[in-house]
């Protein structure tokens, strides 16, 4: 399994109980969509080798996953996994990535800017934008009327038709 096909979901922070469960702290940008769809996790060891582990049972406790692996039945068998990264082949959308838009840049008619605040109004996400050489920030709904493109890799939002919003 190639590392690039795997989604990094968190890190094993501790063991849980004496029967070999581990506690996984999820990354802040990761959201669990279908906990029952998680059947296989991958642990990255210190040599960057990916080790597949079958999930026997899994539950959510606050912002942590508690996972029992099929081949491990005692705390001593899972102690070695503490501090290791956990990855998942997200082929069934059990996890989704939540992007924090406050770290995005904005482009509008060759004018650069930045997102300074975000909000959800019940229907749409909105971003408060401050463009270069302008003193006043304004809200932009992230809908097709006002957005050309939202590039999550480069973290750039390209806007259009926003003159009436300023």
From Swiss-Prot:
Chief place of localization: cytoplasm
Biological-process GO terms, alphabetical: ribosomal small subunit biogenesis; rRNA processing
Single GO MF descriptor: ribosome binding
Pfam families the UniProt entry points to: RimM (PF01782)
Keyword Disulfide bond found: no
Cell compartments where the protein resides: Cytoplasm
Keyword Cell wall biogenesis/degradation: no
GO cellular component: cytoplasm; ribosome
Transmembrane regions listed in the UniProt entry: none
Keywords: Chaperone, Cytoplasm, Ribosome biogenesis, rRNA processing
Domain PRC barrel: 90-165
Domain notes: The PRC barrel domain binds ribosomal protein uS19.
Family according to the record: Belongs to the RimM family.
Quaternary structure, from the entry: Binds ribosomal protein uS19.
Function: An accessory protein needed during the final step in the assembly of 30S ribosomal subunit, possibly for assembly of the head region. Essential for efficient processing of 16S rRNA. May be needed both before and after RbfA during the maturation of 16S rRNA. It has affinity for free ribosomal 30S subunits but not for 70S ribosomes.
PANTHER family named in the record: RIBOSOME MATURATION FACTOR RIMM
Protein name per its UniProtKB record: Ribosome maturation factor RimM
Organism of this sequence: Mesoplasma florum (strain ATCC 33453 / NBRC 100688 / NCTC 11704 / L1) (Acholeplasma florum)
């Amino acid at each position: 399994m190639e590392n690039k096909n795997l989604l990094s979901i968190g890190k094993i922070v501790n063991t849980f109980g004496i029967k070999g469960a581990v506690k996984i702290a999820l990354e802040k940008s990761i959201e669990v969509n279908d906990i029952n769809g998680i059947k296989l996790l991958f642990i990255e060891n210190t040599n960057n080798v990916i080790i597949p582990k079958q999930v026997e049972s899994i539950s959510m406790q606050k912002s942590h996953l508690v996972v029992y692996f099929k081949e491990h039945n005692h705390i001593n068998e899972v102690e070695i996994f503490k501090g290791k990264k956990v990855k998942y082949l997200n082929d069934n959308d059990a996890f989704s990535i939540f992007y924090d838009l406050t770290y995005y840049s904005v482009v509008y008619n060759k004018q650069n800017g930045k997102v300074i605040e975000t909000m959800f109004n019940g229907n749409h996400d909105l971003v408060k934008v401050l463009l270069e050489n302008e003193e006043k920030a304004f809200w932009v709904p992230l809908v097709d009327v006002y957005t050309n493109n939202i590039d999550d890799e480069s973290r750039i939002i390209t806007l259009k038709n926003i003159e009436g919003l300023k």
